[in-house]
Swiss-Prot record:
CDD domains: F-BAR_Fer, SH2_Fps_family. The gene is Fer. It comes from Mus musculus (Mouse). One of its GO terms (cellular component) is lamellipodium. This is Tyrosine-protein kinase Fer. GO terms for molecular function: ATP binding; epidermal growth factor receptor binding; lipid binding; non-membrane spanning protein tyrosine kinase activity; protein kinase activity; protein phosphatase 1 binding.
Length: 823
């Protein structure tokens, strides 16, 4: 089996094979070039990450930490990995890619040689087997005619007896020519037969076998290139494996049980001597009737002691019940953690248990505090019981002998004594009414304040599912607070408070069907918030946060989900579906929804558009009607713009749109962008697809999902993100620097889209090709039928230096003049 024996008549197939392989090699070459670029960028990114890490922060001056050592080694090994990846990229460029480029040239030469030789031998074969034989046959037929003609003339001459010799000579000559040509034809025919046999049996098979041999040699070479590529790009080479081994070894050296031994040794302090708490005997210097550490039982205190004893007994019982409940909760949580630990598939899954473990430790602290309270109550109760039992059945002795005192004082003094007695009696009465205040009980009195049955969403301080950042911006003074639904965990509620210069966020716990922070539980969130607001009870003892000023939501923009009816699906956006809908008053609207399973940062970006649009009111900016953030999913309600997106509009109506209308569209966008520029708003995604066509063909700028409002008019973005490359200015692509000037560049691209009637910019180029061409100075040519004045504006917008681009005010003026010029 081979080319020579099986592909004698498959010239077209061989050529197609060579063409296909050349295209394949070009694809491989392009792939390798992109891989080299990708690896270089990856190496640069790794190095950049390491440079951004403050290595000094990982070094403790007086504390040896294995975690710190491990982290520092991770950074060092990541730098090493960066160097390895860079070296690999360079080796890939100088090795496989260079050889592949040479191989492509050689393969092109092989094809060229094959085509040339095949054409040559095929032409020779046709010449020998067809062309020359046809010439001989044609001459053969002619000479037969000439011979027959000479023969007839010779016969006529014989019959007439005239010029016989001359006619005979002509006849002999014609016969000789024919016989000689006959011999030539016989020889040529023999040669043609042999040539054809040689062509099909030897010459052509030899050529095809030669091609096959070179094809196979190139496959062998390509295999070698692939092998080099595989080895160079392998992520399991010894040097890369060693990097990860070093990291793994450093991680394994982390021992949680000994991590803080050195820290303890360095910062160890001697135990402070406990302060002795004793009765201050100086209090008794002016009174002889009271005794240190003795409960006074007399006619003034007997009743109150009974009440205090009863209260302490109740408190002790309540504390013991709570203690049993907490201890059971500790055991239950320990069991749950143990079960969860057994199901962990990865070591890092332990992170998922940290919250439960922290809750367990807090429970244990609560148990210890309750035990302390139990011991304190038991000791106080025992002291009271001892005194009461000692005097059981006895009549309480009087404190003061009034008859004796009456003989030694005046009537005025008696009144003063009686007044003092009354004050003492009233004080004791106060003690009897609130014995816990005397005993310093740690148990809190559950004082539930009725707040009605209004749903949570109807309370002004409830802001729904607004982002954490937006909530923080609303909190400005001590005690400012609001409640919101967690963005990251729908269904979980958070109290956000400004306290002591910080914005604090407390998750509202829901346990045993009660809402609480760490104290009293309530059946709903409004009761919980109202209790802490009215009583000024701290949210947690550790934080000491007190609620002072409820921050009301902006009712102008807030709508309830029930106020909106969803209609037909209009399309899908970056964050979720977009629906047509109506408000209660039948106003048609567009409803943007946010998927509930989106990452937290994308949900924040979703609401960023509404936050920006709240501030704007302009006929060429799409209007915000409101937001529904009271529950998930979150909605943004916009005005319904009936004409749809501008890009689709251009493509559908391209045959009927006049030049003046296109200039009007451009003027509308310029007016809208001029307004945004005055508000220091950077759109960052200006394009035909992000504009909407309203009534009377008024164009409105939409889709502010990437927009930013910056006081300085410049926004810096870092990180790898999906950006509209063909619409984005070079400085934004290269350095993440966005400004009104970068919006002007995008406006120039939008102008090109408008006057090309919806053609994609940089036609025939990929994003990367367009980016590279722009860097080299390339700019798109004018669309067909585009006015020269408009194309001049485009070129101004595409100036490489941002400071040289026109302002939107200038663009608006120039387009106004152009509009007047066009009839």
């Amino acid at each position: 089996m081979g080319f020579g024996s099986d592909l004698k008549n498959s010239q077209e197939a061989v050529l197609k094979l060579q063409d296909w392989e050349l295209r394949l090699l070009e694809t491989v070459k392009k792939f390798m070039a992109l891989r080299i670029k990708s690896d270089k960028e990856y190496a640069y990114t790794l190095q950049n990450l390491c440079n951004q890490v403050d290595k000094e922060s990982t070094v403790q001056v007086n504390y040896v930490s294995n975690v710190s050592k491990s982290w520092l080694l991770m950074i060092q090994q990541t730098e090493q990995l960066s160097r390895i990846m860079k070296t690999h990229a360079e080796d890939l460029n100088s090795g496989p890619l260079h050889r592949l480029t040479m191989m492509i040239k050689d393969k092109q030469q092989v094809k060229k040689s094959y085509v040339g030789i095949h054409q040559q031998i095929e032409a020779e074969m046709i010449k020998v087997t067809k062309t020359e034989l046809e010439k001989l046959k044609s001459s053969y037929r002619q000479l037969i005619k000439e011979m027959n003609s000479a023969k007839e003339k010779y016969k006529e001459a014989l019959a007439k007896g005239k010029e016989t010799e001359k006619a005979k000579e002509r006849y002999d000559k014609a016969t000789m020519k024919l016989h000689m040509l006959h011999n030539q034809y016989v020889l040529a025919l023999k040669g043609a037969q042999l040539h054809q046999s040689q062509y099909y049996d030897t010459t052509l098979p030899l050529l095809l076998d030669s091609v096959q041999k070179m094809q196979e040699e190139m496959i062998k070479a390509l295999k070698g290139i692939f092998d080099d590529y595989s080895q160079i790009t392998s992520l399991v080479t010894e040097e890369i494996v060693n990097v990860h081994k070093e990291i793994q070894m450093s991680v394994e050296q982390i021992d949680p049980s000994t991590e803080y031994n050195n820290f303890i040794d360095v910062h160890r302090t001697t135990a402070a001597k406990e302060q002795e708490i004793e009765f201050d005997t100086s209090l008794l210097e002016e009174n002889e009737n009271l005794q240190a550490n003795e409960i006074m039982w007399n006619n003034l205190t007997a009743d109150s002691l009974q009440v205090m004893l009863k209260t302490l007994a109740e408190e002790l019982t309540q504390t013991q019940q709570m203690l049993l409940h907490k201890e059971a909760a500790v055991l239950e949580l320990e069991k749950r953690i143990e079960e969860s630990f057994e199901t962990c598939e990865k070591k890092s899954d332990i992170v998922l248990l940290l919250g439960q473990k922290q809750a367990l430790e807090e429970l244990k602290q609560s148990v210890q505090q309750l035990r302390c309270t139990e011991a304190k109550c038991a000791a106080q109760k025992a002291l009271l019981e001892q005194k009461v039992q000692e005097n059981d059945g006895k009549e309480p002795p009087p404190v003061v002998n009034y008859e004796e005192d009456a003989r030694s004082v005046t009537s005025m003094e008696r009144k003063e004594r009686l007044s003092k007695f009354e004050s003492i009696r009233h004080s004791i009465a106060g003690i009897i009414k609130s014995p816990k205040s005397v005993l310093g009980s740690s148990t809190q009195v559950c004082d539930v304040i009725s707040v009605g049955e209004r749903p949570l969403a109807e309370h002004d301080w409830y802001h729904g599912a607004i982002p954490r950042i937006e909530a923080q911006e609303l909190l400005k003074q001590q005690g400012d607070f609001l409640v919101r639904e967690s963005h990251g965990k729908p269904g979980e509620y958070v109290l956000s408070v400004y306290s002591d210069g910080q914005r604090r966020h407390f998750i509202i716990q829901f346990v045993d069907n009660l809402y609480r922070f760490e104290g009293t539980g309530f059946s709903n969130i409004p009761q919980l918030i109202d209790h802490h607001f009215n009583t000024k009870q701290v949210i947690t003892k550790k934080s000491g946060v007190v609620l002072l000023n409820p921050i009301p939501k902006d009712k102008k923009w807030v709508l309830n989900h029930e106020d909106v009816s969803l209609g037909e699906l209009l399309g899908k956006g970056n964050f979720g579906e977009v629906y047509k809908g109506t408000l209660k008053d039948k106003t048609p609207v567009a409803i943007k929804t946010c998927k509930e399973d989106l990452p937290q940062e994308l949900k924040i970006k979703f609401l960023q558009e509404a936050k920006i649009l709240k501030q704007y009111d302009h006929p060429n900016i799409v209007k915000l009607i409101g937001v529904c953030t009271q529950r998930q999913p979150v909605y943004i309600i916009m005005e319904l713009v009936p004409g749809g997106d501008f890009l689709t509009f251009l493509r559908k109506r391209k045959d009927e749109l006049k030049l003046k209308q296109l200039v009007r569209f451009s003027l509308d966008v310029a007016a809208g962008m001029l307004y945004l520029e005055s508000k220091n708003c950077i759109h960052r995604d200006l394009a035909a697809r992000n504009c909407l066509v309203g009534e009377n063909n008024t164009l409105k700028i939409s889709d502010f999902g990437m927009s930013r409002q910056e006081d300085g008019g410049v926004y810096s973005s870092s990180g790898l993100k999906q950006i509209p490359i063909k619409w984005t200015a070079p400085e934004a692509l290269n350095y993440g620097r966005y400004s009104s000037e970068s919006d002007v560049w995008s406006f120039g691209i939008l102008l090109w889209e408008t006057f090309s009637l919806g053609v994609c910019p940089y036609p025939g180029m990929t994003n990367q090709q367009a980016r590279e061409q722009v860097e080299r100075g390339y700019r798109m040519s004018a669309p067909q039928n585009c006015p020269e004045e408009v194309f001049t504006i485009m070129m101004k917008c595409w100036d490489y230096k941002p400071e040289n681009r026109p302002k939107f005010n200038d663009l608006h003026k120039e387009l106004t003049v152009i509009k007047k010029m066009i009839t």
